[in-house]
């Protein structure tokens, strides 16, 4: 089975022990599956982008800084995964080529203007993944931002079309925190790849790989 895991930068802590826990889980999954991991930029990206804006950088240049940060995080994770390719691919074709030699391929961002969620969804489509797992800091897709709206309802299961509708609605509201971005949602709809949106813990990743009920399932 081909598994694509989007690991948010906020989920991948700077603590070495937590990185090791994720690495062990990925190694375990890779024993019987081909695993592709796309890592977010997290705090590192935010700090560098903030400084770059203060220094007058364009938004596109800031995107490139964010991409560089995701690739640094990818290298950090690779350091803890013996079976992973030691090279961070810069595009999907290179990722696919590396997967012929390694059970685990870890990459960061690719295109300016694309989040790593969108990158991971596009990668999943490109390699014809069997499952796409979006590991984030929320335990699924909600009707509203659960951190600011106590009446928000969590969805256990959604169709790809419903996901696009919910994300479109949320994205239109200023200042809202969307668990998955609109481009990623549209790619999921187009590719029809089974998707899990989960709270990013090693345990939840294993559950999603096994097809157990966890987070929000989009199918």
Curated annotation (Swiss-Prot):
Keywords: ATP-binding, Cytoplasm, Kinase, Nucleotide-binding, Pyrimidine biosynthesis, Transferase. It holds the Pfam family AA_kinase. UMP binds at residues 41, 63, 110-116. ATP binds at residues 9-10, 42, 46, 136-137, 142, 145. Disulfide bonds: none annotated. InterPro entries: AceGlu_kinase-like_sf, Asp/Glu/Uridylate_kinase, Uridylate_kinase, Uridylate_kinase_arch/spir. Pathway: Pyrimidine metabolism; CTP biosynthesis via de novo pathway; UDP from UMP (UMPK route): step 1/1. It comes from the Archaea. Inhibited by UTP. It is found in: Cytoplasm. It catalyses: UMP + ATP = UDP + ADP. Its EC number is 2.7.4.22. GO terms for molecular function: ATP binding; UMP kinase activity. The keyword Kinase applies. Its main location: cytoplasm. One of its GO terms (biological process) is UDP biosynthetic process. GO terms for cellular component: cytoplasm. Catalyzes the reversible phosphorylation of UMP to UDP. Belongs to the UMP kinase family. Homohexamer. This is Uridylate kinase.
């Amino acid at each position: 089975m081909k598994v694509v895991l989007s690991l948010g930068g906020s989920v991948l802590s700077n603590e070495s022990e937590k990185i090791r826990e994720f690495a062990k889980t990925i190694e375990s999954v890779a024993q019987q599956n081909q695993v592709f991991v796309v890592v977010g930029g997290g705090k590192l990206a935010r700090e560098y982008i903030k400084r770059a804006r203060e220094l007058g950088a364009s938004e596109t240049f800031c995107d490139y800084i964010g991409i560089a940060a995701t690739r640094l995080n990818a290298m950090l994770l690779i350091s803890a995964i013996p079976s992973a390719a030691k090279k961070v691919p810069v595009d999907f074709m290179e990722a696919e080529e590396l997967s012929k030699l390694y059970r685990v391929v870890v990459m960061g961002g690719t295109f300016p203007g694309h989040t790593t969620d969108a990158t991971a969804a596009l990668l999943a489509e490109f390699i014809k993944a069997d499952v796409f797992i979006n590991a984030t800091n929320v335990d699924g897709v909600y009707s509203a931002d659960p951190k600011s709206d106590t009446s928000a309802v969590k969805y256990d299961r959604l169709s790809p079309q419903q996901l696009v509708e919910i994300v479109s609605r949320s994205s239109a509201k200023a200042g809202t925190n969307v668990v998955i971005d609109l481009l990623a949602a549209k790619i999921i709809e187009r590719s029809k790849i089974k998707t899990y949106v989960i709270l990013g813990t090693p345990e939840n990743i294993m559950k999603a790989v096994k097809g157990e009920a966890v987070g929000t399932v989009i199918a």
